[in-house]
Amino acid sequence: MITLKNNNGIPKYTQIIQSIEKAIEQKVLQLNEKLPSINKVVLTHNISRDTVLQAYDELKKRGVIYAILGKGYYVKSTEIKPKKRFFLLFDELNIFKEDLYNSFLKTIGSEAEIDLYFHHFNTNQFKKLIQESKGNYNKYIIMPTNLIEATESIKTLPHKDVFILDQTNPDLLQFPAVYQNFVKDIYDGLAKGKQHLQRYSKLILIFPGFREPIGLKIGFERFCHDFNFNHEIIADFTDINVIQNCVYIIPSDRDLVQVIEQAKRQKLQLGVDYGIISYNETPLKKLVENGITTISTDFETMGKTLAEMILKNSKTQIENPSRIIIRNSI
C-alpha cells in the first residue's frame, strides 16, 4: 500500500501521504478502514518514526484520516483532492528572481506545493534535475536560459504540463511561456532614452556572453545601427579604465560595481563624465550614485502572469512588459 522510492527528490513523508491518498482514490482503503500502524511502516520501510508521524499528522490536517487513542489511524474521508505539486527550476536566486517567486506564490495561493530548484547555468545540473523530476509533479516551470541541450531535456517531460519562464527560443514555441523579449526590450529602452544618450560619444555594452541572453547583444547592435551611435561590445571589465564621455550598458551587477569603483579611482563623476545603464531594476539602484538608470522587465508581473496562466490552464505565450527608468546616471 505504501511505496517509497529512494533518490527521487521527494521527501519520504510526502511519499507516504501520496501513497495513502492514492490507495483511498483507488478504493484499496475504504471509509473508516484502519491504516498500517506507525510501527509497521517504520519496520517495513526502515524509516524514522518521526517521518511517519509527520505524514499522518498532515493527513489529519487535511481531513483525510482520524486517530483513535490507543487504537490507530482510520480513513475519515474518501473525497480526496490531492494537493498539486509544482516543480520550479530557476537559473539562480537574486533579488529580482525573489520578487518573481514571491509574486507567483501570492497568486497561486494554496493551490499547490512548490519545490524550487536552481541549475546555476550548469548544463549537467539542469539535465539531472529535469531527469529526477519526471513523473513527480503536476506542473514543470522552467528557466532554460541559454543552456545547450536544455530543449532536449525539457522535451522529455509531459508537454501539457510544461511552462517556460523568462527566456525562450524558437525550439520551445510549443510550450506556453511568460518571457522577456530581450531584443525588443533593450532596443525600445535605448530608443526612449535616446535624447539623453546623444550627448555621449560612444555606447559600450559589457557582454561576457555566458549567462547573458544573446538578444541583448542583437538589440543593442540594431539600435546603434538604426540611430547611428558609435558603439563597442567588450567581454569583461577587468584591469581597464572607464572611458570618459561613454555610456556603459551593463547586464551584470558585478560589472556594475567594478565600473563605478574604477570611475571613482579615476575621479570621474557619473552622469557628467560618463554614463551607466544597468539591466534589471532593484531598490538599491534608486539610491546608488543618486540613481542608476535601468532597463528592466517587471518581475512581479511575470510571476503573477505565470500563476494566472496555470490557474486558468492557458497555453499561450505572453511577452512580459519592460521599461527604462531614467535616473542620474545618464
Question: How would you label these PLM feature ranges?
Answer:
Residues 188-227, 318-330:
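An alpha-beta-alpha
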Residues 87-88, 136-145, 202-208, 244-252, ...:
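Periplasmic-binding protein-like
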Residues 254-330:
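Flexible loop/turn connectors
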